[in-house]
Amino acid sequence: VVGAILLSYVAVFAFGVRTTVIGDSMSPTLVGGQEVLINRLVYNIFEPRMGDVIVFKPNGNENAHTYVKRVVATPGDKVRIMNGILYVNDAPEEFFTDSIANAGIASSEIKVGEDEYFVMGDNPNSSEDSRNANIGNIKKSTIMGKAWFHMAGGTEGLGRIR
């Protein structure tokens, strides 16, 4: 069993898709310059869930850099940011310890459409995400996969992304 696990990790490192986190929008979970491994198959079987860290190209723009953000709302959810607090389906969410300074387009209620996701950086006051009109809700077709493992960087060594 240990050999199979080791072999799978070697296969992922050798053949896995990597991307580099740009900026500090996912701090403290991930830091700028840190590399993450992407599971490209998981969303062919399952739907992204609230709390997943995903990798995507905004609006499907292949020339854009990859974005790494956390799913905070899924299809059918209603999202709004009021008084620095994220509300999903009228319930406050505790993803963020700091008050959210810029509500962006989420200052008014946003309905997340079918096959769409509302994403934010873990450091929302330094993040370009679904609150920005030029990004908005993320279509499932633009998601490259789930960021599941981070390389050494920041204060952490190798490890799973939570």
Predicted regions and their residues:
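Soluble "head" domains of membrane/secretory-pathway proteins
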Residues: V17-T20, P28-R162
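Hydrophobic alpha-helical transmembrane segments in multi-pass membrane proteins
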Residues: A4-S8, R80
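Aromatic-capped interface at the extracytoplasmic side
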Residues: S8-M26
